[in-house]
């Protein structure tokens, strides 16, 4: 785990759990009798392809203000296990954690977060949603967001232009 500003205290040093997509389907013979079960899974920890694809679908070219960037993250608990959020050195922010206020709202209370949030090292316009396991228990979060500053600057410029003409 990477020390993260505004995250809840956590005595752990590392994330030892895994989050995976698991699927199984029956295989029947011609007489419709069960012959086998085909089972498979994909470990989502470190799965950059998933968040990069999600990010590409949501934030197409030209949809954000100049200087902003779209981001997506999959959390196990409040820990980033797949993300395109970057640390200062440009590496993916794996092992960093969500802020305590987001964690409480989404994981503890089971609510969707649609607001500004501190994400690793800056403020983002953010959406977080609980990820549920097959028993309906909250096990993580899905996040998408974009840098707040370029959006705020563009909105402020638009408002100044609008009211300057009045």
Language model features: what each stretch is:
Residues 36-43, 125-152:
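Short, hydrophobic beta-strand elements of compact beta-sandwich sensory domains
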Residues 18-23, 34-36, 70, 122, ...:
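Envelope-exposed proteins and targeting segments
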């Amino acid at each position: 785990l990477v020390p993260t500003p505004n995250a809840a205290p956590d005595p752990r040093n590392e994330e030892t759990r895994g989050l995976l997509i698991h699927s199984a389907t029956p295989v029947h013979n011609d007489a419709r009798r069960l012959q086998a079960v085909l089972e498979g899974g994909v470990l989502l920890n470190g799965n950059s392809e998933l968040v990069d694809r999600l990010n590409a679908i949501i934030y197409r070219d030209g949809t954000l203000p100049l200087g902003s960037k779209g981001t997506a993250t999959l959390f196990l608990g409040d820990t980033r296990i797949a993300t395109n959020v970057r640390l200062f050195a440009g590496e993916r922010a794996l092992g960093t954690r969500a802020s305590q206020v987001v964690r409480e709202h989404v994981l503890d209370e089971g609510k969707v977060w649609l607001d500004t949030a501190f994400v690793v090292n800056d403020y983002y316009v953010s959406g977080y949603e609980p990820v549920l396991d097959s028993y309906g228990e909250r096990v993580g979060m899905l996040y998408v967001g974009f840098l707040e500053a370029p959006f705020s600057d563009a909105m402020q410029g638009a408002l100044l232009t609008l009211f300057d003409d009045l």
